[in-house]
Amino acid sequence: GLIVTNGDQTDTVWEYLAKGESWEAALRTRQFEDDAPNWTPRISGLQAGDGSYKLSILKSADPEGMACARFFYEYPAVPGLGHFLHTYVCDGNPVIPTFQGEPERVSIPADIDDFTRELWENLNPDNKISLFVRYTDLETRKYQQRILNKHSK
């Protein structure tokens, strides 16, 4: 499988899975980032060997950051279809509003470079940091991947 996150919860997920415990159990030990007043959500993704995948977002359940709301989603592998979670809805002042609702459905074109470019160009330039895109042939297990980072040349 493949684990992708926007924080150090990657290690927690890896450790739990290595012990035979669940992804959900791992993420129940974690919460949003302690960066009041925004309480940055923690987003995680896990792809299984058959191409199915899970997504999670951990966010503050209240403006004071006193409780964590945990959302888990599971999807089968459907060629050309994926789901997208992001940290924030838009800019905010003084508080940035966090993502709301279910993960967004996205069409995935056959060309990885076209898809990578489309995703990167549609991320807010002031907020984007990095992007990881991987295409995997489920029969041969061969994959292509792209990693973009706004701080790399």
What are these regions (language model features)?
Residues G1-K153:
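Conserved short alpha-helical segments that host acidic/polar catalytic motifs at enzyme active sites
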